[in-house]
Amino acid sequence: MSVQQMRVEITKVYKGERWRLKVLRMTDNQVIAVYHRFVKDGLIKNY
């Protein structure tokens, strides 16, 4: 999964516009870390 795909998936976890903008401003490493945390916590289904 690419970082851009991870970014899209973590954007879906919370519906707010502020969250979406925060995700868009995250570095690639932050996106990867948040994605793996959300998978671990069961907020995102790992494909």
Language model: regions and residue ranges:
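Basic helix-extension-helix modules of the SAP/HeH family
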Residues: M1-Y47
